[in-house]
Amino acid sequence: GAYICGDETALIKSLEGERGQPWSKPPFPAIEGLYSKPTVVNNTETLANVPPILMNGADWYRTMGTEQSTGPKIMCLSGHIKNPGNYEIIMGDMTYRDLLFGEDYGGGILGDKELKAILPVGGSGPMITPEALDAPITYEGLKPFGSDMGSGSVVILDETVDVVWAARKMAKFFEHESCGKCTPCREGTFWMYHLLERIEAGNGSEEDVKTLVSVAEQIKGKTLCALGEFAVSPVVGTFKHFANEYQLKVTGK
């Protein structure tokens, strides 16, 4: 199904042959899910951890990682990185610096350019800057920097990237993937994309930037599923760290 089917209730609707749209909970899938039967929905990585836990026991599994982030984790590196790919790590045993620059992992920034920013959850989470490189790779490690590890889909942006361009690309994705069921997400993603398109083209104003941030804030906490929350991340994250680039687009200075 579509990206929206990352929401468990939308996935269930898709499996039933209906349009992949989330429903308002309750009822929760564990009570009333697929064909109105109790349903447990987990992702593939979670299910892959079940057999070794059954074979070796929960205590064995808890010897890996931290108290809050237990076990191994598959991290995906993409973007401006020398060695893109999937890497299995033990949570808490390494930092983002180790992951990006370690010879057995990312190997450094492509073309030996400077690192500008990291999308630790792809477009679905707030951007971080090089100051967070020494944060441990755990679910809690990026909280001091206002972000999180999420699914571990790490996208690297080098010094040449126009962050307004990057935000516009991500906003377009979320506008396209919104199922349209709830108004804040449907209308919010539409306006965020078109405002970013105008700003990136050099036709925006300072008022457009204010409206963009306001629209993003209005989406938060008002959507049926997490897609709407994810959609504001490109705007909030880029504006938090690179407000000067927005200013340059609309004022030329």
Model-found features: residue ranges?
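Hydrophobic alpha-helical positions that pack around
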Residues: 1-91
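Ferredoxin-type iron-sulfur electron-transfer modules in oxidoreductases and energy-metabolism complexes
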Residues: 136-253
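Extended, hydrophobic alpha-helical segments in both membrane/secreted and soluble proteins
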Residues: 96-99, 114-115, 178, 192
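Hydrophobic alpha-helical scaffolding
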Residues: 1-5, 36-43, 85-90, 108, ...
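Terminal amphipathic helices with adjacent charged low-complexity linkers/tails
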Residues: 108-145, 240
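Short acidic, glycine/serine/threonine-rich loops at helix termini
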Residues: 4-17, 23-26, 52, 87-89, ...
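Short amphipathic, charge-patterned alpha-helical segments
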Residues: 92-110
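Short, solvent-exposed loop/turn segments at the edges of secondary structure
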Residues: 70-72, 113, 148-152
